[in-house]
Curated annotation (Swiss-Prot):
Protein name per its UniProtKB record: DNA repair protein RecO
InterPro entries tied to this protein: ARFGAP/RecO, DNA_rep/recomb_RecO_N, NA-bd_OB-fold, RecO, RecO_C
Protein's organism: Acidovorax sp. (strain JS42)
Keyword set, alphabetical order: DNA damage, DNA recombination, DNA repair
Pfam families: RecO_C (PF02565), RecO_N (PF11967)
Amino acid sequence: MAARRIADEPAYVLHSYDWSESSLILETFTRHYGRVALVAKGAKKPTSNFRPVLLPLQPLRVTYTLGGEGHGEIHALKGAEWAGGHVMPTGDALLSGLYLNELLLRLLAREDTHAPLFDTYAGVVRVLATVDHEGEHGDALEPVLRSFELLLLREIGLLPGLDAETSTLAPLHAAARYALVPEAGLRPAVPADRAALSGGQWLALQGALDEPARYTATLRAIATAEAPVAADLKTQLRALLQYHCGSPLLRTRQLMMDLQKL
């Protein structure tokens, strides 16, 4: 029986590693099939048509057959073309994109479809490609990352509702302070909490996440928040992500922290 063939599938390369002297294993994020592992035979050869194409943060169209190389979860790449649209992000935007790739690798199960998340990711990558990390648009990175983090956590069921206390389901009071804690979800803040937001701020984020255009609405809500609010949201989301990603620390996050010390 001929192997089933998936043709012209929208995809991004999240990561690649050596399979043999001449071949690579690609971890890809596809629109209709989620995170898919592909073997790209001969991709490391100087004459391979794959070499200039199989790059991270570039929109691709891939064709592959299921169950390549005798491994059920690793499929055989047959073709890949650049889908066009934007150039590779650079500088801080490139690091930010690689950070998002690492989150997807750590948090998405293999071949679990997340088409809305794919579309959001594609939009974020387009934004990153337009950011001048040394120019006036550099400040756009933080709300872009926070918005994607929120949407990723919600898509895979790891974000509690932001309109009620997680353990009691009691509605939030707009003026009270609440902390998002990995082990307990959203709860009233205590003095020991490193960061917290007001009930009104959490409710605004929940409202944005419930909008039909949720990425745009969430981005607007975060971009217009005052600096202390954005900083506290970042602290809480990073703790939640690290909790679910496990140890060690995300490599791209560690690299960004190291560069900030230079």
